[in-house]
């Protein structure tokens, strides 16, 4: 369950982002994302009931010690999870725009789920132009930094960074501050081959990263569609249907062993507790509830699934 403080959301100016994420979550339901099932609220909080994903974030599973980095086969499995989740949301007309290890959560079977749609956008190539700078430094694409038009391919740059980070244990574009990171994303050339690739990793993995980290959107792997990524030689042995139906035992790949090994790294991020200071913010809270800002934050997936084309809830009766 995700507990969201109304006051905190108001004070941080995140109401629009929360509404956007809520509306996007209602559109999505897929085996490899964090799905919304129910939402309700009380006077102070909004509660979102999402998939139970106890394995922690991918960030918490990236070890500091190079010898503990994932194997190539493990990385290919994890990346295939991410690719399928991106394929699904892109088919629903959604650009994620914040793909990073913190927004990928493990379930208890060792599969990754895409989460956090707070800055995602609904995209239509015919009439949508997205230029704003959003995302996390170190993972955003060059076109976002330069305020050039964004599209689904912008998500694939972040995918390339994650592959690089899982192999080398660090991001390809680093810096002392946001400006330096952005400068490196725009100008630092990344070219991997069998000579400078990490030991025991293939030249195909190097080629995969090189093509995802192309600076120009139209030259990036996936610019002709996500099937271009799925058919790359590095992923030629991936059984996409079996992964989508979770017929691959991640335990046999050693993924569950990694989750157990690093479970102490799974820090629970606690929301700032406004309950202890709520008196100070009573005026704000009264304003929020009086204006009914969050009036539409009620959702029931079962009812929504059973609606007809006119929005009326129907019941399934035995014939």
Regions found by a protein language model. Give the residues of each.
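Activation-segment/catalytic-loop signature of the eukaryotic protein kinase fold
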Residues: 39
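Conserved N-lobe beta3->alphaC-helix segment of eukaryotic protein kinase catalytic domains
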Residues: 3-28
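Conserved short submotifs of the Hanks-type protein kinase catalytic core
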Residues: 44-57
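AlphaC helix of the protein kinase catalytic domain
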Residues: 59-69
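Activation segment signature within eukaryotic-like protein kinase domains
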Residues: 78-79
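C-terminal regulatory tails of eukaryotic serine/threonine kinases
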Residues: 223-315
């Amino acid at each position: 369950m995700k507990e969201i403080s109304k006051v905190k959301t108001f004070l941080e100016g995140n109401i629009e982002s929360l509404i956007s994420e809520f509306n996007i979550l209602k559109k999505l339901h897929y085996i490899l994302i964090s799905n919304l099932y129910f939402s309700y609220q009380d006077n102070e909080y909004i509660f979102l009931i999402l998939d139970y994903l106890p394995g922690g974030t991918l960030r918490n599973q990236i070890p500091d010690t190079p010898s503990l980095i994932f194997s190539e086969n493990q990385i290919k499995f994890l990346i295939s999870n991410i690719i399928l989740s991106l394929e699904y949301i892109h088919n629903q007309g959604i650009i994620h725009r914040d793909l990073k290890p913190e927004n990928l959560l493990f379930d208890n079977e060792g599969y990754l789920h895409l989460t956090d749609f707070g800055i995602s956008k609904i995209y239509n190539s015919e009439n949508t132009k997205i230029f704003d700078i959003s995302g996390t430094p170190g993972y955003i694409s060059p076109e976002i930094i330069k305020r050039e038009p964004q599209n689904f391919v912008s998500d694939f740059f972040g995918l390339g960074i994650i592959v690089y980070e899982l192999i080398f244990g660090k991001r390809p574009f680093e810096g002392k501050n946001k400006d330096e990171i952005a400068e490196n994303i725009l100008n630092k050339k990344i070219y991997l081959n069998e000579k400078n690739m990490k030991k025991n990793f293939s030249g195909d993995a190097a080629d995969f990263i090189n093509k995802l980290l192309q600076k120009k959107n139209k030259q990036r792997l996936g610019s002709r569609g996500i099937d271009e990524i799925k058919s790359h030689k590095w992923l030629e042995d991936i059984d996409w249907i079996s992964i989508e139906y979770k017929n691959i035992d991640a335990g046999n790949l050693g993924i569950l062993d990694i989750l157990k090994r690093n479970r102490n790294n799974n820090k629970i991020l606690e929301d700032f507790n406004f309950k202890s200071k709520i008196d100070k913010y009573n005026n704000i809270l009264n304003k929020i509830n009086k204006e009914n800002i969050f009036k539409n934050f009620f959702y029931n997936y079962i009812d929504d699934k059973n609606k007809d084309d006119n929005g009326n809830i129907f019941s399934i009766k035995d014939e």
